[in-house]
């Protein structure tokens, strides 16, 4: 019997991913207004980033300068093209387009910047993959409107979406609405809730009820944006985006199995609504059981049904094991009941390294939704050492990515998952979202910038640069 070797599709989208606030810098250039990430201080592993009410003198805000993609984008895109990128995921900084968020007219200088950047990508046949909201909400909307707790913000977001859809309708095909929207489930950790929504949930009398009200507004905004995109250009594809951390039961104890299932369901509600178009019974039962009053307007449920997303983008970095009783993790970490998994290793930041978990995640998501999937974040944050000759031998990053790509290929060629592409996170070094560090590096491209703010921003290729170039050229066959 002849066994045919299956490969990834020829149109598979290989590339890399970043977010505007982590790479662009130029926080007050070109008419840009302050966003919620512009008031996040630097931090470190074990030292949380501080959220300030405004930009304060004497505080260090690494996102203000980031790695100056705003001034280096042509140089950086040329390097992406050298690697052979088929696509590049980034976000449009909302406050470059609407500096306060509630203006009637957009900022033309901001629109022109993205025109130029997209043109530069398309010059090299690199498809832009664009997130509308990647932790970049206008600070003014937080201060004056209470952020997404206020229904008016739905209209402001939809106006922003319509403006950029119309402006870039012939330049950008792939969009996503909200980045890692489900990280609000970690509402006890202020950073996650704040960056996803502009809300510090712990300041509210009933944090979880507030979270669900915020989410309803975001779900409606996402659905209205999807409907607008289809009206403006039916060829555009709009996805939702999930932070996918599969939770394994620590044992076959039925209590552990049930606890893992319930914990995953708390995260799936975000994509259940955006992909299926309705609130699942398990969350409606929770609201009734706990006496939550989620305010909805007439027609909202119709909007959710009519504005389902075209595909599911997700990030994958790790798995966690959980148990019903005796877990060492806490609710603040977002993984209540978690315990160390003895079968996998961990990174310097404690993230469990589990390549097989990526295949598991792909199968779980595809079987649940039967929609195209897109791995829009996956990567290995590490301290990189620059040798005396200038080389950076990041074999650990190559090993991590190789193992994950191998499992990704199995999901496509064995399991039949419909996978659009793969964009490793931080393809160029950037400011870490969770810690505000430069030293937590992910990139194929090294940026000479350091946690104390020093460095000349020069770019250089790591060993992984040429490795990934060969991976793309061989469509994943040469690992």
Swiss-Prot record:
InterPro entries: Glyco_hydro_1, Glyco_hydro_1_AS, Glyco_hydro_1_N_CS, Glycoside_hydrolase_SF
Top-level division of the source organism's lineage: Bacteria
An annotated Gene Ontology molecular function: glucosidase activity
The EC number(s) this enzyme carries: 3.2.1.86
Keyword Cell cycle: no
Record field: catalytic activity: 6-phospho-beta-D-glucosyl-(1->4)-D-glucose + H2O = D-glucose 6-phosphate + D-glucose
Alphabetically ordered keywords of this record: Glycosidase, Hydrolase
GO terms, biological process: carbohydrate catabolic process
GO cellular component: cytosol
Induction: Constitutively expressed.
Active site positions, chain numbering: 180, 377
Described purpose of this protein according to its UniProt entry: Catalyzes the hydrolysis of phosphorylated beta-glucosides into glucose-6-phosphate (G-6-P) and aglycone. It has a high affinity for phosphorylated aromatic beta-glucosides (p-nitrophenyl-beta-glucoside, phenyl beta-glucoside, arbutin), with the exception of phosphorylated salicin, and a low affinity for phosphorylated beta-methyl-glucoside. Apparently, it has only a very limited role in the utilization of external beta-glucosides.
Complexes and interactors: Homotetramer.
Stated family: Belongs to the glycosyl hydrolase 1 family.
Protein name: 6-phospho-beta-glucosidase BglA
């Amino acid at each position: 019997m002849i066994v045919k070797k299956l490969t990834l599709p020829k149109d598979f989208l290989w590339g890399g991913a970043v977010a505007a606030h982590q790479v662009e810098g130029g926080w007050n250039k070109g008419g840009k207004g302050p966003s919620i990430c512009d008031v996040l201080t630097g931090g470190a592993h074990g030292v949380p980033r501080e959220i300030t009410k405004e930009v304060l003198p004497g505080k260090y805000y690494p996102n203000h300068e980031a790695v100056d993609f705003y001034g280096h984008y042509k140089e950086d895109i040329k390097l992406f093209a050298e690697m052979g990128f088929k696509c590049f995921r980034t976000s449009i900084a909302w406050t470059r387009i609407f500096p306060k968020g509630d203006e009637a007219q957009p900022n033309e200088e901001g629109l022109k910047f993205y025109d130029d950047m997209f043109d530069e990508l398309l010059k090299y046949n690199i498809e832009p993959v664009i997130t509308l909201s990647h932790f970049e909400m206008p600070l003014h909307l937080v201060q004056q409107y209470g952020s997404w707790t206020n229904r008016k913000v739905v209209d402001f977001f939809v106006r922003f979406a319509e403006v950029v859809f119309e402006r870039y309708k012939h330049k950008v095909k792939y969009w996503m609405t909200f980045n890692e929207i489900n990280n609000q489930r970690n509402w006890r950790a202020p950073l996650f809730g704040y960056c996803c929504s502009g809300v510090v949930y712990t300041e509210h009398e009933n944090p979880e009820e507030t979270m669900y009200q915020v989410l309803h507004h975001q779900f409606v905004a996402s659905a209205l944006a999807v409907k607008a995109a289809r009206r403006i250009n039916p060829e555009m594809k709009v996805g939702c985006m999930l932070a996918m951390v599969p939770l394994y039961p620590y044992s076959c104890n039925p209590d552990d199995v049930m606890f893992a299932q319930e914990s995953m369901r708390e995260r799936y509600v975000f994509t259940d609504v955006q992909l299926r178009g309705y609130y699942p019974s398990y969350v409606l039962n929770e609201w009734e059981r706990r006496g939550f009053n989620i305010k909805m307007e007439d027609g909202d449920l119709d909007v959710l049904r009519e504005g389902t997303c075209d595909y599911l983008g997700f990030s994958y970095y790790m798995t966690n094991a959980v148990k019903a009783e005796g877990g060492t993790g806490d609710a603040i970490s977002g993984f209540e009941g978690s315990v160390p998994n003895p079968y996998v290793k961990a990174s310097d930041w404690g993230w469990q390294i589990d390549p097989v978990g990526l295949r598991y995640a792909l199968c779980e998501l595809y079987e649940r939704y039967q929609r195209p999937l897109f791995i829009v974040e996956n990567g290995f944050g590490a301290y990189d050492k620059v040798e005396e000759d200038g080389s950076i031998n990041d074999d650990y990053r190559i090993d991590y990515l190789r193992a994950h790509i191998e499992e990704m290929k199995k999901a496509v060629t064995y399991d039949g998952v419909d996978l659009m592409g793969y964009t490793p996170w931080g393809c160029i070094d950037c400011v870490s979202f969770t810690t505000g560090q430069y030293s937590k590096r992910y990139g194929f491209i090294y940026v000479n910038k350091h946690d104390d703010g020093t460095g000349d921003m020069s770019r250089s290729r790591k060993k992984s640069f040429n490795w990934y170039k060969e991976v793309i050229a061989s469509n994943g066959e040469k690992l």
